[in-house]
């Protein structure tokens, strides 16, 4: 990623990447508590994801496209966590609360990237 806004985006991506690793650890820990073996490779993880793998735009200075891709990923995660919250609401209180917490983080991330997109579009005009 290069250009005027690269440093701002890099800092936020690093922060959110660390947060996402924390999400993965929490989910893996819960899976183990329930007697499951969590996926351990990227290939295995991608089999379970309904959101797919995020790819960056070919033009590394196309910030608008970059942010829009991140927003699609955040919105997919939000939709998935909402589904899981509904699924576990009356079945498993601990898993339900876990997904509620993760959903809150994803909504915060979405709001951050929406703000970046709005700021970027205003600067572009």
Task: Write out the residue ranges for each language-model feature.
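Iron-associated oxidoreductase/ferritin-like identity signal
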Residues: 1-125
């Amino acid at each position: 990623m290069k250009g005027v806004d690269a440093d701002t985006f890099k800092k936020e991506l690093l922060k959110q990447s660390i947060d996402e690793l924390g999400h993965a650890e929490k989910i893996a820990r819960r899976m183990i508590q329930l007697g499951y073996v969590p996926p351990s490779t990227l290939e295995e993880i991608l089999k379970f994801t309904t959101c797919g793998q995020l790819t960056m735009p070919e033009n590394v200075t196309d910030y608008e496209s970059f942010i829009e891709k991140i927003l699609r990923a955040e919105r997919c995660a939000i939709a998935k966590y909402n589904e899981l919250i509904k699924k576990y609401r009356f079945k498993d209180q601990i898993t339900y609360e876990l997904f509620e917490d993760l959903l809150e983080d994803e909504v915060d991330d979405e709001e951050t990237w929406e703000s970046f997109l709005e700021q970027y579009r205003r600067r572009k005009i």
